[in-house]
Design a protein with these regions (language model features):
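Conserved alpha/beta enzyme-core scaffold
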Residues: 1-273
Length: 273
């Protein structure tokens, strides 16, 4: 039960083929795992949920997590984890919050063991059973790959322009509007084109919701956005912005979009691109 499965998880394919892994739950599957599932190699079911739906399933017990392995760019000997402060920073650890809360056992996996206490901690010592130190947990430079890269595709750029015109010509486009983009090239490009109209009309974004990329963080840095709330960072500029801008806040995937809580951020969105 992973928040997402991609090329980094290709090594799991032989375990799917030999029946070691029978069922998969995730919010998305790409790479060789996606190909294996598409060709019927998974013996059981592949269940896809939204990010908020995954939180709901775990919190209600529909999905039970026996053991959670949480990659932590920095961690101390007692399990205080952060998405910053190490050599493989990823920004925030939002999708792992529910695993840390609900799993029977929690293992923090880090390549940067720091002095105790590693504060502020996104996942704190009360949730973690074991700390495992490895050579490297990831490659930050490869965060912005595939769909997360800015596009040069003219078709996607045209789509972005059309999206921007729709946004700019609706009654919701006024000072304090709320906005979220996906990570696709057209979505990223739409933020860039929208920023020009915002500047021309002196309209400010009250709330930006992420996954976040450089263009959204630039809106915050330029004063065109007032607050960003963040569940995932899709490039190194967004990763670093968590640390440098005090109006850039980590939130949990449950706060973002769980249908079972009393007030998810998605309920307050004017636009999603």
């Amino acid at each position: 039960s992973a928040s997402s499965l991609g090329k980094a998880h290709d090594a799991l394919v032989p375990m799917i083929e030999d029946g070691t892994i029978v069922n998969i739950e995730s919010s998305g599957v790409r790479g060789k795992i996606g190909d294996a599932i598409s060709h019927g190699k998974l013996k059981g079911l592949a269940t896809m949920r939204s990010h908020g739906g995954r939180v709901r399933a775990i919190e209600t017990g529909e999905t039970h997590v026996d053991i959670a392995f949480i990659g932590a760019p920095s961690c101390d000997e007692y399990g205080n984890c952060s998405g910053m402060g190490g050599k493989t920073n990823c920004g925030v650890l939002s999708y792992a919050y529910v695993d840390a809360d609900q799993a029977d056992y929690v293992v923090a996996v880090t390549d940067c063991l720091v002095a105790y206490p590693n504060y502020p901690a996104e996942i704190n010592q009360t949730k973690v059973d074991y700390v495992c130190v490895v050579d490297q947990i990831g490659i930050p430079e490869k965060i912005a790959t595939g769909a997360a890269k800015p596009t040069t595709d003219q078709r996607k750029i045209l789509m972005a322009e059309y999206c921007t015109q729709v946004v700019a010509n609706t009654p919701y486009f006024k000072d304090g509007f709320s906005y979220q983009t996906g990570v696709g090239g057209a979505s990223i490009a739409s933020t860039i084109s929208l920023s020009k109209i915002m500047e021309e009309k002196n309209i400010h974004m009250g709330l930006g919701v992420g996954g976040l990329t450089k263009p959204m963080c630039e809106l915050l840095d330029r004063g065109l956005a007032y607050k960003l709330v963040d569940t995932q960072d899709f490039d190194l500029d967004a990763v670093n912005n968590v640390r440098t801008n005090p109006n850039h806040f980590p939130i949990s995937a449950g706060e973002y979009a769980s249908p079972m809580n009393k007030g998810a951020f998605v309920n307050k969105l004017d636009y999603v691109i």
